[in-house]
């Protein structure tokens, strides 16, 4: 009986430990790899560029905003929303380890922010270039 209780207790501890972990935690490199896989089917795709990503990040697009309007010129710095003044944690994974670790959140924020900045969704090329750039930023 004691043996059953010990085994049951250990099993419960393992299950609870697994439940506490994020279900699909990715690394930023894995998110980038998923963009690359998606982009591979695009005619003319030749890879992502940190230079294009930096230009995309800092350029004002269709509206008066750029990514840096809220996230600052330094993605490793804390930002502030241009309209609401809400504080935004650093964008660069080197300064904020939670960034780009959940593909669903990544896609949600790209959808929202691209619509705000570009008045359209971002292409996979733009997302890949952007992430390639942000991954070059050191704290």
Predicted regions and their residues:
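Post-cleavage N-terminal segment of exported redox proteins
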Residues: 2-50, 94-139
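Short cysteine/histidine-rich zinc-coordinating motifs and their immediately flanking basic loops
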Residues: 79-86
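Short alpha-helix boundary/capping elements
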Residues: 61, 75, 135-139
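The canonical Cys-X-X-Cys-His
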Residues: 63-75, 130
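Short acidic alpha-helical/loop segments enriched in Asp/Glu that coordinate divalent cations
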Residues: 27, 68, 82
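TPR/TPR-like alpha-solenoid helical repeat scaffolds
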Residues: 86-92
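Local sequence-structure signature of Cys/Sec-based thiol-disulfide redox active-site neighborhoods
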Residues: 54-65
């Amino acid at each position: 009986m004691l043996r059953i209780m010990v085994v049951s207790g250990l099993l419960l501890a393992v299950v609870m430990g697994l439940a506490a972990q994020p279900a699909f935690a990715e690394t930023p490199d894995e998110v980038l790899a998923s963009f690359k896989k998606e982009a591979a089917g695009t005619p003319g795709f030749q890879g992502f560029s940190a230079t294009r990503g930096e230009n995309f990040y800092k350029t004002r697009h269709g509206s008066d905003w750029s990514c840096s309007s809220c996230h600052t010129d330094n993605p490793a710095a804390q930002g502030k929303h241009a309209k609401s003044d809400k504080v935004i944690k650093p964008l660069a994974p080197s300064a904020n380890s939670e960034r780009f670790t959940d593909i669903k959140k990544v896609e949600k924020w790209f959808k929202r922010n691209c619509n705000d900045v570009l008045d359209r969704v971002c292409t996979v090329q733009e997302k890949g270039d952007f992430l390639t750039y942000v991954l070059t930023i050191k704290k």
